[in-house]
Amino acid sequence: MTMTTAAVFGCTGAVGSQILATLLAIDTFPSVKTISRRLPNVQSPKLEAIEEGDSSKWGGMISSFSPKPSVVFNAVGTTRAAAGGLQNQWKIDHDLCIENARAAKEAGVKTYVFISGAGIRGFVARYLPFSKMKIGVEDAIKDLDFEHAIILRPGMIIGRENPKSALLENIVGGLNKLGQGIQDSLGQDQTVIARAAVAAARMADEGKAPSKYWVVEMADIVRLGRDEWKE
Protein backbone atom coordinates (compact mmCIF):
# COMPACT_ATOMS: atom_id res chain seq x y z
CA MET A 1 0.00 0.00 0.00
CA THR A 2 1.31 3.44 -0.91
CA MET A 3 -1.49 5.39 0.69
CA THR A 4 -0.39 6.51 4.15
CA THR A 5 -2.16 9.74 5.03
CA ALA A 6 -5.83 10.65 4.71
CA ALA A 7 -7.64 13.92 5.34
CA VAL A 8 -11.34 14.37 6.07
CA PHE A 9 -13.55 17.40 5.50
CA GLY A 10 -16.90 17.22 7.27
CA CYS A 11 -15.54 14.99 10.03
CA THR A 12 -18.22 15.95 12.57
CA GLY A 13 -21.21 15.19 10.34
CA ALA A 14 -23.17 11.96 10.05
CA VAL A 15 -21.12 10.27 7.32
CA GLY A 16 -17.89 12.19 7.89
CA SER A 17 -17.68 11.15 11.53
CA GLN A 18 -18.07 7.53 10.49
CA ILE A 19 -15.42 7.90 7.78
CA LEU A 20 -13.07 9.23 10.45
CA ALA A 21 -13.92 6.40 12.84
CA THR A 22 -13.32 3.85 10.08
CA LEU A 23 -9.97 5.36 9.11
CA LEU A 24 -8.82 5.32 12.73
CA ALA A 25 -9.90 1.69 13.18
CA ILE A 26 -7.93 0.19 10.28
CA ASP A 27 -4.20 -0.09 9.62
CA THR A 28 -4.28 1.22 6.05
CA PHE A 29 -3.94 4.84 7.17
CA PRO A 30 -1.36 5.39 9.93
CA SER A 31 -1.94 9.15 9.73
CA VAL A 32 -5.33 10.89 9.58
CA LYS A 33 -5.90 14.66 9.38
CA THR A 34 -9.09 16.67 9.88
CA ILE A 35 -10.02 20.33 9.50
CA SER A 36 -13.36 21.41 10.95
CA ARG A 37 -15.23 24.18 12.75
CA ARG A 38 -15.29 22.06 15.89
CA LEU A 39 -13.03 19.21 16.91
CA PRO A 40 -14.25 15.66 16.32
CA ASN A 41 -15.40 13.72 19.36
CA VAL A 42 -12.67 11.07 19.04
CA GLN A 43 -9.02 10.79 19.96
CA SER A 44 -6.25 8.66 18.51
CA PRO A 45 -2.45 8.75 18.20
CA LYS A 46 -3.07 8.62 14.43
CA LEU A 47 -5.22 11.74 14.43
CA GLU A 48 -4.19 15.34 13.87
CA ALA A 49 -7.33 17.45 14.22
CA ILE A 50 -7.33 21.17 13.46
CA GLU A 51 -10.14 23.43 14.64
CA GLU A 52 -10.70 26.37 12.29
CA GLY A 53 -13.90 28.39 12.40
CA ASP A 54 -13.21 30.12 9.08
CA SER A 55 -13.99 27.49 6.45
CA SER A 56 -12.48 29.66 3.70
CA LYS A 57 -9.07 28.74 5.13
CA TRP A 58 -9.61 24.97 5.04
CA GLY A 59 -8.43 24.30 1.51
CA GLY A 60 -5.19 26.20 1.92
CA MET A 61 -4.35 24.20 5.02
CA ILE A 62 -4.07 20.91 3.14
CA SER A 63 -0.59 21.71 1.85
CA SER A 64 0.60 22.49 5.39
CA PHE A 65 0.04 18.94 6.62
CA SER A 66 3.08 16.74 7.11
CA PRO A 67 3.02 14.20 5.68
CA LYS A 68 0.71 15.51 2.99
CA PRO A 69 -2.46 13.47 2.47
CA SER A 70 -2.64 11.26 -0.59
CA VAL A 71 -6.41 10.89 -0.24
CA VAL A 72 -9.06 13.39 0.83
CA PHE A 73 -12.60 12.51 1.85
CA ASN A 74 -15.16 15.31 1.50
CA ALA A 75 -18.36 14.67 3.45
CA VAL A 76 -19.27 18.33 3.94
CA GLY A 77 -23.01 18.97 3.90
CA THR A 78 -25.69 21.02 5.60
CA THR A 79 -29.38 21.86 5.27
CA ARG A 80 -31.07 25.03 4.16
CA ALA A 81 -32.47 25.50 7.66
CA ALA A 82 -29.15 24.93 9.42
CA ALA A 83 -27.33 27.24 7.01
CA GLY A 84 -29.91 30.01 7.34
CA GLY A 85 -31.20 29.93 3.80
CA LEU A 86 -30.46 28.56 0.35
CA GLN A 87 -27.78 31.13 -0.44
CA ASN A 88 -25.75 30.16 2.62
CA GLN A 89 -26.29 26.46 1.96
CA TRP A 90 -24.95 26.96 -1.58
CA LYS A 91 -21.79 28.54 -0.16
CA ILE A 92 -21.16 25.41 1.92
CA ASP A 93 -22.48 22.52 -0.16
CA HIS A 94 -21.25 23.90 -3.49
CA ASP A 95 -18.66 26.67 -3.24
CA LEU A 96 -16.73 25.35 -0.24
CA CYS A 97 -16.65 21.81 -1.60
CA ILE A 98 -15.25 22.99 -4.93
CA GLU A 99 -12.68 25.21 -3.20
CA ASN A 100 -11.51 22.26 -1.12
CA ALA A 101 -11.25 20.01 -4.17
CA ARG A 102 -9.18 22.58 -6.05
CA ALA A 103 -6.89 23.04 -3.07
CA ALA A 104 -6.47 19.28 -2.77
CA LYS A 105 -5.46 19.04 -6.42
CA GLU A 106 -2.93 21.85 -6.00
CA ALA A 107 -1.52 20.10 -2.93
CA GLY A 108 -0.86 16.93 -4.91
CA VAL A 109 -3.65 14.78 -3.52
CA LYS A 110 -3.97 11.65 -5.64
CA THR A 111 -7.42 10.37 -4.69
CA TYR A 112 -10.47 12.54 -3.95
CA VAL A 113 -13.62 11.01 -2.49
CA PHE A 114 -16.85 13.02 -2.45
CA ILE A 115 -20.14 12.10 -0.76
CA SER A 116 -22.85 13.20 -3.19
CA GLY A 117 -26.45 11.99 -3.43
CA ALA A 118 -28.55 9.45 -5.31
CA GLY A 119 -30.80 10.42 -8.19
CA ILE A 120 -29.46 13.94 -8.61
CA ARG A 121 -29.21 13.68 -12.39
CA GLY A 122 -32.77 12.50 -12.92
CA PHE A 123 -34.92 14.33 -15.49
CA VAL A 124 -36.77 16.32 -12.81
CA ALA A 125 -34.39 16.04 -9.86
CA ARG A 126 -31.51 17.71 -11.70
CA TYR A 127 -33.32 21.05 -11.48
CA LEU A 128 -33.70 20.98 -7.69
CA PRO A 129 -31.30 23.14 -5.66
CA PHE A 130 -29.81 20.16 -3.80
CA SER A 131 -29.11 18.38 -7.07
CA LYS A 132 -27.63 21.48 -8.71
CA MET A 133 -25.19 21.84 -5.82
CA LYS A 134 -24.08 18.22 -5.94
CA ILE A 135 -23.86 18.13 -9.74
CA GLY A 136 -21.72 21.26 -9.71
CA VAL A 137 -19.28 19.70 -7.28
CA GLU A 138 -19.19 16.37 -9.13
CA ASP A 139 -18.44 18.11 -12.44
CA ALA A 140 -15.73 20.28 -10.87
CA ILE A 141 -14.02 17.24 -9.36
CA LYS A 142 -14.11 15.45 -12.71
CA ASP A 143 -12.59 18.47 -14.47
CA LEU A 144 -9.75 18.64 -11.92
CA ASP A 145 -8.51 15.30 -13.26
CA PHE A 146 -7.29 13.62 -10.07
CA GLU A 147 -5.45 10.33 -10.47
CA HIS A 148 -8.60 8.87 -8.94
CA ALA A 149 -11.91 10.61 -8.25
CA ILE A 150 -14.59 8.66 -6.41
CA ILE A 151 -18.17 9.90 -6.15
CA LEU A 152 -20.50 8.13 -3.73
CA ARG A 153 -24.23 8.59 -4.32
CA PRO A 154 -26.03 7.25 -1.26
CA GLY A 155 -29.77 7.37 -0.78
CA MET A 156 -31.29 8.49 2.49
CA ILE A 157 -28.74 8.39 5.28
CA ILE A 158 -29.95 6.12 8.08
CA GLY A 159 -28.71 6.08 11.66
CA ARG A 160 -28.12 9.75 12.35
CA GLU A 161 -28.51 11.02 15.92
CA ASN A 162 -30.42 14.05 14.66
CA PRO A 163 -32.22 13.01 11.45
CA LYS A 164 -33.09 15.75 8.97
CA SER A 165 -36.46 14.07 8.33
CA ALA A 166 -36.96 11.89 11.39
CA LEU A 167 -40.27 10.31 10.38
CA LEU A 168 -39.19 9.45 6.85
CA GLU A 169 -35.81 8.14 7.97
CA ASN A 170 -37.46 5.98 10.61
CA ILE A 171 -39.80 4.55 7.97
CA VAL A 172 -36.93 3.74 5.61
CA GLY A 173 -34.86 2.40 8.49
CA GLY A 174 -37.67 0.03 9.43
CA LEU A 175 -38.11 -1.39 5.93
CA ASN A 176 -35.49 -4.05 6.64
CA LYS A 177 -38.27 -5.91 8.44
CA LEU A 178 -39.89 -6.40 5.05
CA GLY A 179 -36.60 -7.29 3.40
CA GLN A 180 -33.14 -5.80 3.51
CA GLY A 181 -33.18 -5.25 -0.24
CA ILE A 182 -36.13 -2.87 0.03
CA GLN A 183 -34.30 -0.70 2.54
CA ASP A 184 -31.06 -0.88 0.55
CA SER A 185 -32.78 0.54 -2.52
CA LEU A 186 -33.87 3.66 -0.64
CA GLY A 187 -31.30 4.40 2.04
CA GLN A 188 -28.07 3.20 3.61
CA ASP A 189 -26.72 3.30 7.13
CA GLN A 190 -24.17 6.04 7.73
CA THR A 191 -21.56 3.46 8.76
CA VAL A 192 -22.09 1.48 5.55
CA ILE A 193 -21.66 4.63 3.45
CA ALA A 194 -18.48 5.53 5.31
CA ARG A 195 -16.99 2.08 4.93
CA ALA A 196 -17.83 2.07 1.23
CA ALA A 197 -15.96 5.36 0.83
CA VAL A 198 -12.89 3.96 2.57
CA ALA A 199 -13.08 0.66 0.68
CA ALA A 200 -13.29 2.48 -2.65
CA ALA A 201 -10.25 4.59 -1.76
CA ARG A 202 -8.29 1.45 -0.87
CA MET A 203 -9.27 -0.15 -4.17
CA ALA A 204 -8.10 2.91 -6.08
CA ASP A 205 -4.76 2.77 -4.30
CA GLU A 206 -4.42 -0.92 -5.16
CA GLY A 207 -5.19 -0.28 -8.82
CA LYS A 208 -8.54 -2.06 -8.55
CA ALA A 209 -10.88 0.86 -9.23
CA PRO A 210 -13.00 0.18 -12.34
CA SER A 211 -12.28 3.64 -13.75
CA LYS A 212 -10.34 6.81 -13.05
CA TYR A 213 -13.60 8.67 -12.36
CA TRP A 214 -15.67 6.17 -10.40
CA VAL A 215 -19.30 6.77 -9.45
CA VAL A 216 -20.40 4.44 -6.65
CA GLU A 217 -24.18 4.09 -6.68
CA MET A 218 -26.37 2.70 -3.89
CA ALA A 219 -26.02 -0.98 -4.76
CA ASP A 220 -22.23 -0.75 -4.76
CA ILE A 221 -22.27 1.25 -1.53
CA VAL A 222 -24.05 -1.66 0.13
CA ARG A 223 -21.69 -4.17 -1.49
CA LEU A 224 -18.48 -2.36 -0.55
CA GLY A 225 -19.58 -1.03 2.81
CA ARG A 226 -21.42 -4.04 4.18
CA ASP A 227 -21.43 -7.23 2.15
CA GLU A 228 -17.71 -7.24 1.23
CA TRP A 229 -16.33 -5.00 3.96
CA LYS A 230 -13.08 -6.14 5.57
CA GLU A 231 -11.09 -4.17 8.10
Curated annotation (Swiss-Prot):
Gene3D superfamilies per the UniProt record, alphabetical: NAD(P)-binding Rossmann-like Domain (3.40.50.720)
Q: Keywords in alphabetical order, please.
A: Membrane, Mitochondrion, Mitochondrion outer membrane, Transit peptide
One GO biological-process annotation of the entry reads: import into nucleus
SUPFAM superfamilies, from UniProt? NAD(P)-binding Rossmann-fold domains
* GO CC aspect terms: mitochondrial outer membrane
Read off the InterPro entries from this record. Answer: Epimerase_deHydtase (IPR001509), NAD(P)-bd_dom_sf (IPR036291)
Localization per Swiss-Prot or TrEMBL: Mitochondrion outer membrane
Q: How does it sit in the membrane?
A: Peripheral membrane protein
The residues forming the transit peptide are: 1-46
What family does the database annotate? Belongs to the FMP52 family.
Name of the featured protein? Protein fmp52-2, mitochondrial
Its gene name is fmp522
